[in-house]
Amino acid sequence: MIQNNKKEDRATRFKRVAQRRTDHILNSLRILGNCSNKSTYQYSEEEVAKIFRAIEEQLRITKTRFRSSRPRKFTL
């Protein structure tokens, strides 16, 4: 029973921390979107592509961390 409570505590902590961090990321993306105002900022399509490549690459890495919690085994 104690182990079950620990798991619940870990699950509750995950939800609390993940929700706060996700909200922070989404807010940061909204703020980044403010840079799209061409009357205030000047930028090239290449610069925009570079920004989104970096974001998409980090998103891919983070998704992978959630999908695979065990090390991959080498096979020939």
Predicted region positions:
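N-terminal intrinsically disordered, cationic/polar leader segments
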Residues: 2-76
